Amino acid sequence: DLMNTAAQDLIGRHDFAAFTRLNHGRESTERLVSNCSVHVESDRTLWIDVEGEGFLWNMVRIIAGTLVDIGASRRAVDSIPSIIESGDRAAAGPTMPPEGLCLQWIRYGMPGTGRQRQLAASRLRMEP
């Protein structure tokens, strides 16, 4: 489906400046998204799962708004790379409301690797 196809373009280390609020105050907007997927249940409930090493302010909500726009054909399925490259908040989709957003888990450190890394997963549930 369109949203899952577009979600694959979010995977990797990118500058997600377009997916955070203006004047965010962060030194770096580069983040790693290790997985992004969209699932639609039979009752039309939409699940958007995003996993990464950390998220910017409203990043998951803006990703969700952008993917919903793509699913509704308000944006092209191949628009994610140009949005990322632009670094322009206005180029991305709307910020989805916080209701339904759930931080599922956080894991610190990677056992056996000697690396200290935070991995978090957020899930956004949207009902019709």
Regions found by a protein language model. Give the residues of each.
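Structured-RNA-binding interfaces characteristic of tRNA pseudouridine synthases
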Residues: D1-P128
